[in-house]
Amino acid sequence: MSWTTPKKAILLAASAEGSTKLNAFDNALLKMGIGNVNLVKLSSVIPAYIEWIDELPKNIPVGMLLPTVYAHIESDEPGSTITAALGVGISEGNEGGLIYEYSGYCTKEEAEKMVHKMVEEGFKVRGWKLKEFKAAVAEITVKDRPVAAIAAVVMLPY
């Protein structure tokens, strides 16, 4: 197999219930449109000049390996609120960027604040200038079934 530098990326987030925590995770992936592919977990560097898209292509083959940065959390504790978040920082001139993940028992606002802080620090230590920050956040509260929250950046080779 050969890898190529991704050309496009999309920021996604979803939450879902399921009969088990794993089923809740799978259901959230399906909601995002990435439940029938294989996610290859990446660390958090965005390639230069990547194009950000708003919608997944319709022609992604079942079982395709998709480079993905993601945060996730599952719970079956009634009354608990869980959140997964990704913060994306894009440099001036789109010459690269960073993605930071966070998940925990917290609100959407707390999680987004955390990833924003992480992105700012990541840029600072590299001496990069942050042009744009965006976030994907999913929050859900457990009722009577297990739940999952996922935030992801999926990178596409085409």
UniProtKB/Swiss-Prot annotation:
Transmembrane segments: none annotated. Its EC number is 4.1.1.19. This is Pyruvoyl-dependent arginine decarboxylase. The modification Pyruvic acid (Ser) is found at residue 44. Its cofactor is pyruvate. It comes from Thermococcus sibiricus (strain DSM 12597 / MM 739). GO terms for molecular function: arginine decarboxylase activity. The gene is pdaD. GO terms for biological process: arginine catabolic process. Belongs to the PdaD family. The record marks 43-44 as: Cleavage (non-hydrolytic). The keyword Transmembrane does not apply. Keywords: Decarboxylase, Lyase, Pyruvate. The keyword Lyase applies. It catalyses: L-arginine + H(+) = agmatine + CO2. Binds 1 pyruvoyl group covalently per subunit.
